Swiss-Prot record:
Flagellin is the subunit protein which polymerizes to form the filaments of archaeal flagella. It comes from Methanocaldococcus jannaschii (strain ATCC 43067 / DSM 2661 / JAL-1 / JCM 10045 / NBRC 100440) (Methanococcus jannaschii). This is Flagellin B3. The gene is flaB3. The keyword Mitochondrion does not apply. Keywords: Archaeal flagellum. The lineage of its organism: Archaea, Methanobacteriati, Methanobacteriota, Methanomada group, Methanococci.
């Protein structure tokens, strides 16, 4: 009878051990599934963040040159900012903001819907003949299209720059903060909807010996 009890006891212990083993296997399987799912989510998030970071770094707009127009050789009243997109996504100028400051005032300008196209026939006078008629020059900028191979900037509501396109952002600084005086320091940014901003930073020459003045 004792022998039967011992055998029964061993059998119960064996079944208990088997149950514990199965439970451990199930727990391990659930844990593995959770880890795999978490890893997949993290990988997806990392890929998305990487794509967004690449987009921010690769795309954007660059300021190639800034030229001013001094109507009386004493005060610059017009500013022509030559811009082009970086390698990356296209740039919608209708969603672009230009900030500009002389230290005393800081203005934020938006696209006003005025475009002049000189990419086909050229122009002999950007600052007068081809200058866009900006309706609200204190708060808006116009656009002069210089290079647009695929016609992506023909839409006046959403002029869109692709890689290789070049345009001038036209600002009437005489209306924004009274113009730019000799030796005056100007700084700001051309801020696209996505990507890196173009930098505006220059100090005007001590004298304006000509009407057209290279600033940056």
């Amino acid at each position: 009878m004792l022998l039967d009890y011992i055998k029964s006891r061993r059998g119960a212990i064996g079944i208990g051990t088997l149950i514990i083993f199965i439970a451990l296997v199930l727990v391990a399987a659930v844990a593995a599934a959770v880890i795999i799912n978490t890893a997949a989510n993290l990988q997806h998030k990392a890929a998305r963040v990487g794509e967004e970071s690449t987009r921010q770094v690769a795309s954007g707009i660059q300021v190639l040159k800034i030229t001013g127009y001094a109507v009386n050789t004493k005060n610059i009243t017009k500013l022509a900012i030559l811009v082009s997109p970086n390698v990356g996504d296209e740039i919608d100028l209708s969603s672009t903001i230009v900030t500009i400051s002389n230290g005393d005032y800081k203005a934020s300008l938006v696209y006003g819907g005025q475009i002049t196209y000189v990419n086909t026939n050229g122009t002999r006078d950007i600052f007068n003949e081809s200058w866009p008629n900006i309706a609200n020059p204190t708060t808006e900028f116009g656009v002069i299209v210089l290079q647009d191979a695929d016609g992506s900037m023909n839409n006046t509501e959403h002029p869109t720059m692709n890689f290789g396109d070049k345009a001038i952002i036209a600002i009437n600084v005489g209306d924004v903060f009274g113009g730019i005086m000799p030796r005056e320091r100007i700084y700001g940014e051309v801020i696209p909807e996505f990507g890196a901003s173009g930098i505006i930073e220059f100090r005007a020459p001590s004298t304006f010996s000509e009407h057209v003045v290279t600033l940056q």
